[in-house]
Amino acid sequence: MAENSMYHTHISAKHRWLDLNLKEVWQYRDLIYLFTKRNFVVSYKQTILGPAWIFLTPLFTSIVQAFVFGGIAGIGTDGIPTFLFYLCSNAVWAYFANCLTSNANTFTANAYMFGKVYFPRLTTPISNVISTVIRFGIQMVLVLLFMVYYLFQGTLHPHWLWWLMIPVELVHLGILGMGFGIIISSMTTKYRDLTVLVDFGVSLWMYATPVVYPLSMLGEGWMRTVLQINPVT
């Protein structure tokens, strides 16, 4: 008769600042998949339009911004069609903002699970980022459709080499948003006011980032220098 397999869990103190133990996280990849699936189910549960909101949210936001900032305020977009400029900007900003806000309370929101069973705490932030990447990918389909439309209209002349940087920027913004979110989440366990402050702060941060206006609009003064320090710029 075959002997029963024995599993041993060794728990030890961490001695390094950066001790991610990615090998252990990879062993729990099935759990990351389940958390990612849960995020989608919870987000669109009991909604009439369901996942259609992934398209509708940036679409309506871009229409309003194109009307207000492009039409009324007359802010230029450096030769890019106004609606497409705001659609692309909103998609990228929403990706970063969701990576941050979804992880800003990840430890408090999942505290009931942390106290019952052991699993790498990094699995929940990673699943949040993966969910956001999937939403961004779906929104990029909408962006590409409008790009094709403007290309046929002859009003868009893109620099295709810049598209090669999209995967790099996705990783950069994802890690940045997740990192800020985890730091804030570790602090919200004691200071719950940060939960409200994060939503408010992200809204203000958008206006300190070239989302509703091009960076070239600021010229070469000190304001341009300040905005270039902004990691999301």
What function would you assign to each model-found segment?
Residues 1-233:
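Hydrophobic transmembrane alpha-helices and immediately adjacent juxtamembrane helices
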